[in-house]
Amino acid sequence: GRTTLSRSINSYLALSGKTYVIDPRISTIDTKRTASQIFFALPKLEVSTLNPTWISDWYETSKLASKVITEDQSWSEQVALQTISAGLPKGSAFFVGSSRPIRDIEAFATSRSGIEVFANRGLAGIDGNLSTIFGISNSFEHTYAVIGDLTFLHDLTALLAPTVNNLTVFIID
């Protein structure tokens, strides 16, 4: 598939000796023409028996890994997002910024009910986030948002809008 927007992941992938592209849109996917091999689709594989505990084992391992990672950190972006998401009152809106915040929420926050979660997606997902947050706050008694510092700067002029009293924005640097 298409390369990611993450520089660190792309740099890591560039270290591999071989690159395999599996996608029918080759001309738009392997733009650097560096693929070692190109496939238009994955081969169809027949599985004769399924391990019935595989999914539950994977889920339990994931929970354990998340616990171990967060236990070793006294304060970090992950702990901050975990703390913020756990403290949201029911019935509130929660906007999660692109890039690190949304990845950390997915990886480290505990699922909850009674919270409406929102996110933007654009070319890089950071344009117009404050304006979106202000719009969301018009429909909820309490609105909370977590965004990165660059996301904040990309929509700084939105702060010219009238004051919103039911909104708390956390900016992660």
Positions of PLM-derived features:
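Short, acidic/turn-prone active-site loops that include or flank metal/cofactor-
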Residues: 2, 23-27, 43-46, 120-125, ...
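Structural motif corresponding to alpha-helix initiation and N-cap regions
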Residues: 6, 78, 153-156
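Thiamine diphosphate
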Residues: 102-173
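Phosphate/pyrophosphate-binding active-site segments
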Residues: 11-102
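Short glycine-rich anion-binding loops that position phosphate/pyrophosphate groups of nucleotides
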Residues: 1-5, 25, 99-101, 150
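Glycine/threonine-rich flexible loop motifs
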Residues: 4-12
